[in-house]
Amino acid sequence: MIQDQAALEPEAAASALAGNEFIFDVQGHFVNPTGAWTRDVPEGARPLSFVDTEGCAAADEPGLAYLRCVGRDEFIKDIFLDSDTDLTVLSFVPSTREGEPLTIEEATATAALVEKMAGTHRLYLHGRVNPNQPGDVEDMERLAKHFKIAAWKTYTQWGPNGAGFFMDDAPGLRMIEEARRLGVRNIAIHKGLPFGPQSYEHSTCVDIGRVAKRYPDVNFLIYHSGFVTGKGEGAYDPKRTDGIDALITSLRDNGIGKGGNVYAELGST
């Protein structure tokens, strides 16, 4: 917490704000508040309204104006001007190809703007891949060759018809094999923070150890580590089939230990 005197005394301000910490935000999000996707929003619906918009004037305006609070300008201000963040990864939410709240072209333009402002490359990009819908795996080559993505991002509980997949099901394996072929061997996977009861099993981490063992040359970044909102996390329970325990069990069962190719993320949960 920054003390009040830091606003008045240079020494107090330096003590509160100075430092050599390296801050890497591994999951940033924003949307295009006026993009084509908004034309398909049902009347009266308020997508992304769960986001804290305190202090943003657009939050009080009618219709979808509040989406400006989670748009590009606010993202740049919050992350690169008003915080000590050094590097950020810009990620994507699951969507159909036609309904992306943020396109890769818009993300790339933002990364270029940040680089021009800062003089260094500070915004890294995911490439969104939902391999259980037509066209996404086929588009991976374009993403890798033209947009300098650092990793792929997928959501295993999501599907265009509500049905998810495991990473060692056919869609997941196609995605992994294409990532290997293209040389971008970092795959970020949303696990946990489930979307609802449908396809719930695919939100768990039971498949992670299996694919990590099968593909030791691929890095698997497990966003949220299987954490389930509303369920407590206590001492490790090998019988639990979801939550962080399921990730631990899957890794132990497949011999993935310290220094392996699975990275458990909890900071953005």
Segments from the language model and where they lie:
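An N-terminally biased module of ancient metal coordination in phosphate/nucleic-acid-related enzymes
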Residues: 1-91, 97-102
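Active-site gating/metal-coordination segments in enzymes
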Residues: 4-5, 87, 94-203, 268
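Alpha-helical scaffolding within the catalytic cores
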Residues: 9, 70-77, 107-112, 136-139, ...
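Extracellular/periplasmic catalytic domains that process cell-envelope and extracellular macromolecules
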Residues: 17-18, 81-83, 118-119, 145, ...
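A structural micro-motif
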Residues: 21-22, 86, 121-123, 185, ...
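Flexible loop residues that form catalytic
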Residues: 29, 34, 93, 157, ...
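Aromatic- and acidic-residue-enriched segments that line the glycan-binding/catalytic groove
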Residues: 36-48, 101-107, 146, 197-208, ...
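Catalytic pocket-lining loop regions of alpha/beta-barrel enzymes
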Residues: 150-151, 164-269
